[in-house]
């Protein structure tokens, strides 16, 4: 903006400062209109439903019977229900805190963290954990997509020569070299809808096909491990496996940012409606698969319940194909906040001009990087079970409670105060125990790990 001068006399400093401020606001608006999280705010409430379902229901749902076997009936059902309740509560907290400051929206998890913990500390606490979860999940989904494609190929073409997993990961990644150029959350709503439907579909196939098989002869529900130490460590692994199945909080504020908001109709109303429906869908996916799978196969169930089913072949093949379609959408949901972080850093800190070329380079590099790591370390999911424990538990179970206590300061020993502290303690215990179990799994499985398999 040019500063006008009258009779050779510059405007007063106050006017120059105002003009500079207006320029900054205009530039900020231009950037916000380009960034993926804030560029579109016209989402409907049901968008949040399938975004949350896609983010939360991963292919790990097929491993729930295996984790139930490590916990047993009583503890398994308790963890399944308690995790559902706690994460629904912490998700409600985040939805409420999105617009707690009148006239301001915390569109990103780290923005809420900065408000609660301070500008610098909030970044240091939130961003590393978000990156671990979001980038880690994207890598795992690269491998999962490739593995499911490989399994589908093996079933559909049993006489074909075996093909390395690496090539199936490349095939899976090719879809993301295209889809990753969709600019924002609203533009991937169709992909997310398909993914949400697929998650419900393959979960339904898994538990109905298992139920049709009937309870196996000589089924046993006791702990499978031989020693007490092994049983306890397996218990820790199962605890983390079930609890982290609900860890979708890393993208909830970014999803809510796409919903329009006015003082009379804030975004928390439609967002919460979508979250409740999403959690009903999640329960319809998780509970039948976990309970029916464990009930039919007992402690002999494999870590993917589909692998415990030998027939019908068509159902197993179809379910694997549905898994591929689901993790395509899930990858995009978790990649979008990463795109936003990187693109924000480039245009705000390094002063790159917002452009299609910049976006093209950033997103292709990210997809290529996650693909390469997935090919190089196809056992990355096992590593994430350990390292992810330090990020999944905080971001989903107790960081929202800590921020709630810091911001709202509920009266000591009130119901809100007690509820949040109970969630914090349980979350910290979960983080420690599940990480111990994850480390044990790495040690056990390390002999089977191979790079570039």
UniProtKB/Swiss-Prot annotation:
GO biological processes: amino acid transport
Coiled-coil residue windows: none
Extracellular side: 144-164, 209-231, 298-318, 383-385, 434-453
Main subcellular location: membrane
Gene3D superfamilies: Amino acid/polyamine transporter I
Spans traversing the lipid bilayer: 45-65, 66-86, 123-143, 165-185, 188-208, 232-252, 277-297, 319-339, 360-382, 386-408, 413-433
Record key words, sorted: Amino-acid transport, Cell membrane, Membrane, Transmembrane, Transmembrane helix, Transport
Family of this protein: Belongs to the amino acid/polyamine transporter 2 family. Amino acid/auxin permease (AAAP) (TC 2.A.18.2) subfamily.
Protein name as it appears in the record: Lysine histidine transporter-like 1
Annotated organism of origin: Arabidopsis thaliana (Mouse-ear cress)
């Amino acid at each position: 903006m040019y500063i006008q001068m009258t009779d050779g006399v510059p405007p007063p400093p106050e006017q120059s400062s105002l003009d500079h401020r207006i320029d900054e606001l205009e530039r900020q608006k231009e950037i916000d209109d380009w960034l993926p999280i804030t560029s579109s705010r016209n989402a409907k409430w049901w968008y949040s439903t399938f975004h949350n379902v896609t983010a939360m229901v991963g292919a790990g749902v097929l491993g729930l019977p295996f984790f139930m076997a490590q916990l047993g009936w009583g503890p398994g059902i308790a963890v399944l229900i308690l995790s559902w309740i706690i994460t629904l509560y912490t998700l409600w907290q985040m939805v409420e805190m999105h617009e707690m400051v009148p006239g301001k929206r915390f569109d990103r998890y780290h923005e809420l963290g900065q408000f609660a913990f301070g500008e610098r500390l909030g970044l240091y606490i939130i961003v590393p954990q978000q990156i671990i979860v979001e980038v880690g999940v994207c890598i795992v989904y690269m491998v999962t997509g490739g593995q499911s494609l490989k399994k589908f190929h093996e079933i559909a073409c049993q006489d074909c020569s075996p093909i390395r997993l690496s090539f199936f990961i490349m095939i899976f990644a090719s879809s993301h070299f295209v889809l990753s150029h969709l600019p924002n959350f609203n533009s991937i709503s169709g992909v997310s809808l398909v993914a949400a439907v697929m998650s419900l579909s393959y979960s339904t196939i898994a538990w109905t096909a298992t139920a049709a098989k009937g309870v196996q002869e000589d089924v046993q529900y006791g702990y499978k491990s031989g020693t007490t130490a092994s049983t306890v460590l397996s218990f820790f692994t199962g605890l983390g496996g079930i609890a982290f199945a609900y860890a979708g909080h890393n993208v909830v504020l970014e999803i809510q940012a796409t919903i329009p908001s006015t003082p009379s109709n804030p975004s928390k109303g439609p967002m919460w409606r979508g979250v409740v429906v999403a959690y009903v869908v999640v329960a319809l996916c998780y509970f039948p698969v976990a309970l029916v799978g464990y009930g039919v196969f007992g402690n002999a169930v494999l870590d993917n319940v589909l692998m415990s089913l030998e027939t019908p072949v068509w159902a197993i093949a179809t379910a694997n194909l549905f898994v591929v379609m689901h993790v395509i959408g899930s990858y995009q949901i978790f990649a979008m906040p990463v795109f936003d972080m990187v693109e924000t850093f480039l245009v705000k800190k390094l002063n790159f001009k917002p452009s299609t070329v910049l976006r093209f380079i950033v997103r292709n590099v990210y997809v290529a990087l996650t693909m390469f790591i997935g090919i190089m370390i196809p056992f990355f999911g096992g590593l994430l079970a350990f390292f992810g424990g330090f990020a999944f538990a905080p971001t989903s179970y107790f960081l929202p409670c800590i921020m709630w206590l810091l911001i709202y300061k509920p009266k000591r020993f009130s119901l809100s105060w007690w509820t949040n502290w109970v969630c914090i303690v349980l979350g910290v215990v979960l983080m420690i125990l599940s990480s111990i179990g994850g480390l044990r799994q790495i040690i056990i499985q390390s002999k089977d790990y191979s790079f570039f398999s």
